[in-house]
């Protein structure tokens, strides 16, 4: 019987896979978005920057920055949920990442955003919820909040084309 790996080793491996997935998308770095992993849940953080303000008179976050946060969160959340399942089943080896074999991310088919209120000039958080994930197609819902998770300032729903496993 094989002994289970130490928890710290498993955490480091999962973090390495997540970092490789995120680093594979230049827009994430450009926007300054980072991801916090707690078990299988991911929370995106977009730190406040002055250049993210769209309306300086309110001031309010630019709608494009909000949309970018939500779409990136949905894509990374969907890719991570699939990678998580594969890692748990043992069908994905983190050594692939070390060898430079990065996972392909889903492609956006459509993405609809509901702006519920103005985003304030402060850090924004987002989380994605996969509502359906098949071999070819997936649906994801995402929401963004700032001070109180129960009061999102924007939410989105998107459909994605899943990468083929060639």
Task: State the predicted function of each range.
Residues 1-53:
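Non-catalytic linker/capping segments at the edges of enzyme domains
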Residues 2-12, 76-79, 115-166:
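HotDog/MaoC-like acyl-thioester-processing domains
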Residues 25, 59-62, 103-105, 120, ...:
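A generic structural micro-feature
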Residues 31, 40-42, 107-111, 122, ...:
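A generic structural signal for short beta-strands and their flanking turns/coil linkers
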Residues 50-94:
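Hot-dog-fold acyl-thioester-processing enzymes
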Residues 75-125, 130:
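Hydrophobic beta-strand-centered segment that forms part of the acyl-chain substrate-binding groove
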């Amino acid at each position: 019987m094989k002994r289970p790996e130490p928890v710290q080793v498993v955490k480091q491996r999962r973090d390495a896979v997540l970092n490789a997935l995120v680093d594979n998308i230049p827009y994430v770095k450009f926007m300054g978005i980072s991801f916090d992993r707690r078990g299988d849940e991911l929370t995106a953080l977009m730190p406040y920057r002055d250049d993210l303000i769209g309306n300086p008179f309110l001031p309010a976050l630019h709608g494009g920055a909000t949309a970018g946060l939500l779409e990136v969160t949905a894509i990374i959340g969907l890719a991570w949920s699939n990678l998580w399942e594969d890692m748990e089943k043992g069908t994905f080896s983190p050594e692939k990442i070390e060898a430079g074999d990065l996972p392909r991310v889903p492609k956006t088919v459509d993405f609809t955003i509901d702006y519920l209120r103005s985003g304030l000039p402060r850090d924004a958080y987002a989380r994605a919820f996969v509502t359906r994930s098949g071999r070819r197609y997936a649906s994801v819902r995402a929401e963004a909040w700032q001070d109180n998770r129960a009061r999102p300032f924007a939410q989105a729903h998107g459909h994605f084309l899943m990468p083929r496993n060639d």
